[in-house]
Curated annotation (Swiss-Prot):
The name this protein goes by in its record: Na(+)-translocating NADH-quinone reductase subunit E
Membrane disposition: Multi-pass membrane protein
GO CC terms, sorted: Gram-negative-bacterium-type cell wall; plasma membrane
Gene name in the database record: nqrE
Organism: Alcanivorax borkumensis (strain ATCC 700651 / DSM 11573 / NCIMB 13689 / SK2)
Main location: membrane
Amino acid sequence: MFEHYLSLFVRAVFVENMALAFFLGMCTFIAISKKIQTAIGLGIAVVVVLAITVPVNNLILHNLLEEGALSWTGSEQLASLDLRFLGLLSYIGVIAAIVQILEMTLDKYVPSLYNALGIFLPLITVNCAIMGASLFMVERDYTFGESVVYGVGAGVGWALAITLLAGIREKLKYSDVPDGLKGLGITFITVGLMSLGFMSFSGVQL
C-alpha cells in the first residue's frame, strides 16, 4: 500500500507534472515566476488548495453525485439519482470556497505575501491546474486515500516547477539575452526546455 501511494506521489510530481507535462495553470505560472520568494509562496498556496480540494471533491463525487451515492439516505428514489452532471459546478464551488478561506488567512497572518501575490491569489480559483487535478481524480477513479496523495503530489509538482522557473529567470536577469527574446520570449523557451527535461521521467515505470 505504501509503495502504491509513493509511486502515485512521485508520478504526480515528476512524470505527470501539472505545469510541465500538461501545461496547466500557465497564466499564473508565467506571471508569478519572476522572484523565487513569491513563487514559493504561491506554490505553497497551490499545494494547500490542491491537498484540500481534490479529496473534498472525491467525497462529494462518491457520497453525493454518483448513481447510488445517496443510498445512505435510505430512499430508493434518491439512491437511483445520477447527479454527476453537477460535478463541474460542485468542484468550482469547493475550489472557490477553499481559495477564499486561504486568501483571508494570508491577508491576516502573512500580509506581505498576500500583497506580493496580488490579483493572482484569487485567480487560483480559475487556475486550470486546480480544476484539472479534480477532473483527473474523477477520470482515474481514485479512492479517497489516493486523491489525498494525488492532490498533494500535483501541488508539490506545480510548486517545484514554478520555483525552478523563478530561479532560472532570476539568473537570466544577468545574462546577455538578445533584445527580441527579452521578457516572455526567453521565458517560453525556458519553460519548453524545462518541459523537455521533465519528459525524461516519462520512461520511469512506477
